Amino acid sequence: MTTVEQSLSGMSGAAGILDRERIIATAGFNRWLVPPAALCIHLCIGMAYGFSVFWLPLSRAIGLTAPKACPDMSLLQELFTTSCDWRVASMGWMFTLFFVLLGVSAAIWGGWLERVGPRKAGVVAACCWAGGLVLGALGVYVHQLWLTWLGAGVIGGIGLGLGYISPVSTLIKWFPDHRGMATGFAIAGFGGGAMIGAPLANLLINYFKTPTDVGVWQTFLAMAAIYFFFMMVGAFRYRLPPAGWQPDGWTPPSEAKSMITQHQVHLKDAHKTPQFWLIWAVLCLNVSAGIGVIGMASPMLQEIFGGKLIGHPELGFNALSADQKTIIAGIAAGFAGLLSLFNIGGRVFWASLSDYIGRKNTYYTFFILGIILYASAPMFAQMGNKALFVAAFCIILSMYGGGFATVPAYLADMFGTLFVGAIHGRLLTAWSTAGIVGPVVVNYIREFQLAAGVPRDHLYDFTMYILCAMLIGGLICNFLVKPVADKWYMKPEEVAALQAAHAKSDAAIKHGSFGIGKGGFDLPSLIFWCFVGIPLAWGVWKTLQAAAALF
């Protein structure tokens, strides 16, 4: 047991309210209260996608009206300077910290989460994410980039990892009949967090800024308080089903027909199977392709279409005036917002669809359709057809999000539900890898093409074919996924012993609807869904307003 785990165990001993045994559901509990609890946490940590909203204000934190630049400053000097403004590129490393630490922390503490339950993990995630923002605010206030990286990037990144995986196995256990849909709803929140957080951050920055302050550190503190409240609500609303519980009238699907195992694979063995590494590669390649596009969505649209975006098809990007470039930058921001919306919607749509067509077939769809769309994108650009180009990338980003939301159910199908949260945590190292590979491939190919004199409207053609090759690799890996060999399955007595250990005080009902099938949503569940749904609806509305500039 690590020092972190020992301290957390001590905390639970003093405050048994966080113990796993305290959150076993009793008869009458409505399982539809669990997805909005997960959304409370995911909508908060999803702001990681929207952190770029802080870069421009922070790039003039000292200069105020314009950046106080120090061109000869090294990155090491930049970490400690108090007299020069930070470069946007240096602050952009926050994204790398976020997603590397997300994967690493999920892998390290996934097993601990399975032992202690989602409530304690959710509370620790809230403390890390909100606490990281507080430390980041201090870094902004004293103008120390290293402190901002440590707070928001490292400590916040640990909160991202624990918060991201905290609901996964719980939702899969509550919804064995709709695994994909349940995880799709929760993980959609991570994609939707920036839709709420970015416009909220803008509002707060404008409220707090003064002639002598850009208003960012105050915004960090305000958002830390808001996020801590919402995440604690989510953590304390988590409930676990009694061991062995299943919905009334539900019959587990046939293993032979569905590739859904009724057995369990232990956490210590899952990574020894070829299935784990094949699914790891499937996720990594799907995410590498999509995340590269997300990072370059705005400049890509501007450079490919140039004056076509504002009714001047004869003008390329370099021929535009400064004012015209400002206008098309606003249009491109709407494109990025639209991609974000499809990223979220795809998480619910594709994960829910996977319950009917199967996880393997869903990933076949991602790769085959993705290859077609990436290969067609240069043709759409050459045709000057903005609508087809935008539609293609909206579908691509829906499958990017769908890949995240479908993979927990894929793992549960392969390895069972007993350790799926911890196995998913280890698999998220694929995301950490993709977070480096995808942007590097897209950005460096763009720079190479630019240096070679390739016209801006053709800068991304070769990139699209490289991304196609990635998806072909993912398609092959998905094809190779077969059911896990019998030798890796736990013996029935081992499973029974673990379930008994997890249910010390649980003599509760093994079967029952827990409110589902006999009325569906009740008033408490409806109120809780509104609690998370109203902020999300506001974020969608703000995104649609920004996207309207495209048309």
Task: Specify the residue positions occupied by each region the protein language model found.
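Hydrophobic core of transmembrane alpha-helices in multi-pass small-molecule transporters
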Residues: L43, G132, L145-L162, C284, ...
